[in-house]
Amino acid sequence: MIVHRIIPSRVKDPLTRFKPLKNLTTSSSPVFEPSSSSSSSSSSASFSVSDSFLVEKICFSLKQGNNNVRNHLIRLNPLAVVEVLYRCRNDLTLGQRFVDQLGFHFPNFKHTSLSLSAMIHILVRSGRLSDAQSCLLRMIRRSGVSRLEIVNSLDSTFSNCGSNDSVFDLLIRTYVQARKLREAHEAFTLLRSKGFTVSIDACNALIGSLVRIGWVELAWGVYQEISRSGVGINVYTLNIMVNALCKDGKMEKVGTFLSQVQEKGVYPDIVTYNTLISAYSSKGLMEEAFELMNAMPGKGFSPGVYTYNTVINGLCKHGKYERAKEVFAEMLRSGLSPDSTTYRSLLMEACKKGDVVETEKVFSDMRSRDVVPDLVCFSSMMSLFTRSGNLDKALMYFNSVKEAGLIPDNVIYTILIQGYCRKGMISVAMNLRNEMLQQGCAMDVVTYNTILHGLCKRKMLGEADKLFNEMTERALFPDSYTLTILIDGHCKLGNLQNAMELFQKMKEKRIRLDVVTYNTLLDGFGKVGDIDTAKEIWADMVSKEILPTPISYSILVNALCSKGHLAEAFRVWDEMISKNIKPTVMICNSMIKGYCRSGNASDGESFLEKMISEGFVPDCISYNTLIYGFVREENMSKAFGLVKKMEEEQGGLVPDVFTYNSILHGFCRQNQMKEAEVVLRKMIERGVNPDRSTYTCMINGFVSQDNLTEAFRIHDEMLQRGFSPDDKF
């Protein structure tokens, strides 16, 4: 009889005074020695007269139920074990008695593959599948024992033990359960080469596991061998192979496969439909998914909760939220009750859209139907409110986690900590972190990174360094993001030496360096004007085959232009163009700044006009940079012309406070205070609020003309607008 399922034996051991075979497997002492050449040959090859006499004595003692059998077992060797079991082939009670007594008296007996195989056959025939599997596991885990030796041993003892093919089913299942799938496949191939038949249930276990870990080609090889062997497949086989096609992205072959198996009398069931609907939904092929779903009733199947959940999730993931709500309503009309998975999909999509009203509506509906939200639902809600800055609501949902009988995990805590860090409430974030640890919830790298980012943003580098040291002491390995956060923090404070030390630490620890890390360092050294180090960092990045991004080029070009290295900036520009990287508005503005700082505002204007002709759309900074450049060159007519061009030609670009301040500065420097006064009034009329720099410039202009009356008038206006003068006044 073919055994389809491994279950603990219900057969009672006739000798209850003996310990069961599990004693053989629980011993921690080594019980095997390397297999000798005799272990894979016939037991009679080196079977002596004394061994034969010993076997007779053991068999006689077993039949008589004598207690002195132990005295005989002490002289036993593996070949004699095999011979005893051969003699017991027609009396399984004696065979079991022998196996149990051997295990009880000599748990460390040095078995060979042959002796274990004979025991396995007897135990399988006796229905003691759990004990047989224990013996198989011992054989499988033996060092230096190949699949060929195991299969040969089972084969050579097969007939003499009166065994059946269910032994080989058990072998395949044991490999699968031990997660030794490559070995299971090899054993299956060997068994088929010897003409043994493996049941479809064991084959399903093998191909199902192969598909699950992505070894689809091996699974198809087993399936084809099953088909050749004439073993009848069943609907489980069908579903496994349909899943294999879906997993391999070969959806177009499903129809042909189903036609082939239906010719064999095997037809799809509801699992088949759900598998295909899930595959189509995950790829966003929703029309195909709906077509299958609508076809189900005609085949005698009703879409269930799993079916609806799959479709709703697919619609949500591919941005079709309104359609997902329609399917949800249809689900309710069909009498099905949504579960937490249903609501999770809707909540996550509503949260992603940032729709607070809709999200709360879905959550409220969920609670009204007595569906308990899971941690993912709560984390989605909390994430929505922390992103929008509504920490009170986020905290309310955090407390609801506990009220629902759930234990907040590190994801839940990290979301709330991140919200407080964004608000600059570091002390509250740290209190939450302490609560998290007290609750036995371990911090991971993401949690540390979140707090580190908050500390660095608040320029609390000392605290950040302490937290980083704590992280490493807890044996948590920082990732590239961790160190990039710290590098950025030190760069922003001008601690470039500390930043470089962290960068070197990344290299020493072989932490993956990415373009973000390099960009951070480039920006830090570029802003302090250390062009040589910036170029060294660039060269190091390129040598490691890390491709610069448009941001990388923008940082380097800006650094070069800020120092007036226009020729080098153009070399970088040309390299960027040669790599088909389209210049960004930031890069163009940097080039314009380079011209202006070199005293060539006219060339900067020509550059801007050329870029506009090539489709570049300038922004306020583009014009402001040029206007300031012409003001520095005391070319006020050009500066005014650009303001007019900015307003009229570009449509939508409105002069801002920097634009007006640049013009004011030019007039004040030339002692043209009437013109400066006109610009100030026009600025206010157009709704552009002057800033402290505006008033300071005007006051200094009047003071330079010894016009203290006007200077004090502007000073009073400045105070009325809430600005305080600086120390220079």
UniProtKB/Swiss-Prot annotation:
Pfam families linked to this entry: PPR (PF01535), PPR_1 (PF12854), PPR_2 (PF13041)
Which UniProt keywords are present, listed alphabetically?
Repeat
| Keyword Repeat attached | yes
Respond yes or no to whether keyword Repeat is given for this record. yes
Where do the PPR repeats lie? Answer: 112-147, 164-198, 199-233, 234-268, 269-303, 304-338, 339-373, 374-408, 409-443, 444-478, 479-513, 514-548, 549-583, 584-618, 619-649, 656-690, 691-725
For bias type Low complexity, the affected ranges are 27-45
* Domain of life per record: Eukaryota
Q: Which PROSITE patterns match?
A: PPR (PS51375)
Q: Where is this region: Disordered?
A: 26-45
The entry assigns this protein to a family as follows: Belongs to the PPR family. P subfamily.
Write down the NCBIfam families for this protein, in alphabetical order: PPR (TIGR00756)
Report the protein name in the record. Pentatricopeptide repeat-containing protein At5g01110
